[in-house]
Amino acid sequence: GKVVTLPSVSTIADGTAVKTPGNRLFPYLQKNLDDIITVPDEDLIVAFLDMVENHKMIVENSGLLTVAALKQLDVKDKKIVSILSGGNMDVITMSSVVQQGLVQRSRIFTVSVLLPDKPGELVRVASIIAEANGNVIKLEHNQFVSINRKATVELRITIEAFGHEHKDEIVDKLEAAGLRPRIVKVNI
């Protein structure tokens, strides 16, 4: 192999985002490395959320590469040491990574439903979500989505859930009530 230069690098692991690896490092890696694992940003987001929720640690994305890479390997019943490093992350980035992680895990999701424009419909939808143990964290009520706005309004509901199965349960209950929910991009 040889050292190659990438035209660009885009990753949330900015501490390791280099177009060209160092010339001194390459011969060492060539001699001692068995394999290279690439880690997508989505896996780093999940690893970050795991560290915050389960270990109460803030580790910057580059420092989590080993943890995220381990999830791609069969390491069950093996003794593994994963080196964690760095806490150099600003709160805006941290907030964004946490939100993306919650969305990936279906802990937060947004649905859009079209409702008749009459009193009681919002309460009906909120009751269905509450009965399914979902927690409404944001509502957007838009009367101007339909050409025939006197008859229909769009309601976008951002919901907190316990994960993928719970999200599916909530969506199924909305569907069973005839609401035809559509999953849309979370906008918090």
Predicted regions, residues:
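Active-site-adjacent helical/loop segments in soluble small-molecule enzymes
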Residues: 22-78
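Glycine-rich phosphate/pyrophosphate-binding loop at beta-loop-alpha junctions
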Residues: 1-31, 71-116, 126
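Glycine- and other small-residue-rich loops at beta-strand/loop junctions that grip anionic moieties
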Residues: 14, 18, 36-37, 56-59, ...
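Glycine-rich beta-alpha junction loops
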Residues: 12, 20, 40-44, 63-65, ...
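Alpha-helix capping/termination and helix-coil
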Residues: 20, 52-55, 74, 88, ...
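A conserved regulatory-domain signal marking ACT and ACT-like small-molecule sensing domains
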Residues: 91-188
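A generic structural signal for well-ordered coil/turn residues at beta-strand boundaries
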Residues: 12, 53, 61, 107-109, ...
